[in-house]
């Protein structure tokens, strides 16, 4: 019996290679349709919100934008924000910005807020938020330079300017939270939702 029972693949409203890999590893067939939305504009119009609320809003807006053009399809949106105290970070624009961000996070504990939403025909069928707390070790500037040289521009694709699934793990001394939350896709609640609705084998 196949694990995926829905008539059509799940639509992923994201260009994230990591999210795609997580879902495909769980035997979820995908149609990938990255959402084209103005994330910063949406945040501005929403006014003052918490990091978790921002992630949830953007996950919904991504799914909603793609679902509008795909009637009847299950569309998954996902987003992640990083907060250090009251400061919320966005993806670094370049390696220089990534370096400054990692220097700011060095030796401190920050939070990753991940959110997912499934929308079909404009209706929100499922929403979930999760938080992970990560503490960076006090690494040297020379280590930071070597890390960025090895990791390259890939770090700018992540809100944290690191990839814990790769060499970014060397930046940390403690991690609290679900691995999939850190990757930006809380997988277990999503799988539970899909099973409860008969779209995955139970």
Indicate where each model-derived feature is located.
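Short beta-strand-to-turn element immediately C-terminal to the catalytic PLP-Schiff-base lysine
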Residues: 83, 117-119, 137, 174
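Residue-level signal for inorganic ion chemistry
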Residues: 23, 59, 79, 98, ...
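Active-site oxyanion/phosphate-handling segment shared across diverse enzymes
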Residues: 127-201
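Anionic-ligand binding region
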Residues: 99-104, 114-134
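Mobile beta-alpha loop/short-helix "lid" or hinge segments that flank ligand
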Residues: 28-40, 117-123, 157-169
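N-terminal polybasic phosphate/anion-binding patch
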Residues: 1-74, 87, 142, 149, ...
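Active-site-adjacent loop/tail segments of enzyme domains
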Residues: 80-110, 136-138
């Amino acid at each position: 019996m196949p694990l995926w029972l829905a008539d059509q693949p799940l639509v992923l409203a994201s260009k994230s290679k990591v999210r795609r890999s997580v879902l495909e590893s769980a035997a979820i067939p995908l149609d990938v349709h990255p959402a084209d939305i103005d994330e910063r504009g949406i945040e501005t119009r929403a006014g003052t919100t918490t990091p978790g609320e921002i992630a949830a809003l953007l996950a919904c807006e991504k799914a909603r934008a793609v679902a509008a053009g795909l009637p009847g399809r299950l569309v998954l949106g996902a987003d992640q924000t990083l907060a250090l105290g009251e400061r919320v970070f966005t993806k670094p624009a370049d390696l220089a910005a990534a370096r400054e961000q990692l220097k700011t996070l060095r030796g401190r504990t920050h939070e990753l807020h991940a959110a997912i939403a499934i929308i079909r025909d404009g209706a929100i069928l499922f929403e979930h938020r999760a938080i992970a707390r990560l503490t960076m070790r006090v690494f040297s500037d020379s280590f930071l330079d070597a890390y960025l040289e090895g990791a390259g521009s890939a770090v700018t694709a992540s809100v944290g300017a690191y990839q814990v699934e790769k060499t970014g793990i060397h930046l940390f001394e403690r991690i609290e939270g679900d691995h999939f939350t850190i990757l930006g896709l809380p997988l277990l609640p999503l799988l539970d939702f899909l099973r409860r609705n008969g779209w995955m084998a139970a």
